[in-house]
From Swiss-Prot:
GO terms for cellular component: cytoplasm. GO terms for molecular function: coproporphyrinogen oxidase activity; metal ion binding; protein homodimerization activity. Involved in the heme biosynthesis. Catalyzes the aerobic oxidative decarboxylation of propionate groups of rings A and B of coproporphyrinogen-III to yield the vinyl groups in protoporphyrinogen-IX. One of its GO terms (biological process) is protoporphyrinogen IX biosynthetic process. Its EC number is 1.3.3.3. This is Oxygen-dependent coproporphyrinogen-III oxidase. Transmembrane segments: none annotated. A divalent metal cation binds at residues 121, 131, 169, 199. The gene is hemF.
Amino acid sequence: MERPELPIGLPDDIEEKKAAARNWFEGLRDTICASFEAIEDDLEGPLSDQEPGRFVAKDWSRENGAGGGGRMSMMEGRVFEKVGVHTSTVYGEFAPDFRAQIPGAKDDPRFWASGISLIAHPVNPNVPAVHMNTRMVVTTSRWFGGGADLTPVLSRRRTQEDEDSQLFHKAMEIACRNHAVADYDAYKTWCDEYFFLKHRNEARGIGGIFYDWLHSSEEAGGWDADFAFTRDVGRAFAMVYPKIVRSNFNKLWTEADRDEQLIRRGRYVEFNLLYDRGTIFGLKTGGNVESILSSLPPVVRWP
């Protein structure tokens, strides 16, 4: 989807809106971390004799005089081989070669951005990998973006008819249908197009939703409507993914399943380093490199 021209100008209470968004993202982070730790505690199948994982939080600040920072929350456990739930709030100026690509930054390079980003690589190949992020960006304009997508790593489960796929899609659809500013069909298509490895001519997973540059008019509800939708995307994810994990995490798997999982993880690496907009944005804005690249899986195999 082509980047639209967004209206220039910010509301008088933009600082209050920034604070509200940041508080939401950080609260969602804490909710998800607690939910994932509970999953670690409740495992009864393979590897249940190991100690359950716990998140380790690490705060970071931007260097070289740039503003803001964030918190990395990483866990390596018996259910989640590697999961990162990160929040950041950063501000400063875009580099000259990046300004024209960002709405409202061509003539004024100042920006502020806050968001949450999550990626989970489970141990059990029966449990799909997942990615979710939502964010608010302010230049001389303002907008929300984000989404969530599911990646089953076993080919027999990587279908639209699989119960995990249908459950995930339904949760994202409900989150969209409850908000007039959201367009589920467009966001689902956008996700399918975005999370596609062109060099392999294949999808990364089974999809989900993806949206960006969400800036609704005051007549349509404005910032409040956009923020309400973004919150519901986070809530939908926090409800549906733990349910999917719990329905699969006690199942047995084979060495062949593990091999297939590691090969599928390679597709994650390829996408994130070649195409991912969030990775590029983070590196271009002086983000925390360790946090940005923490989305990469811990063990990968290429055939």
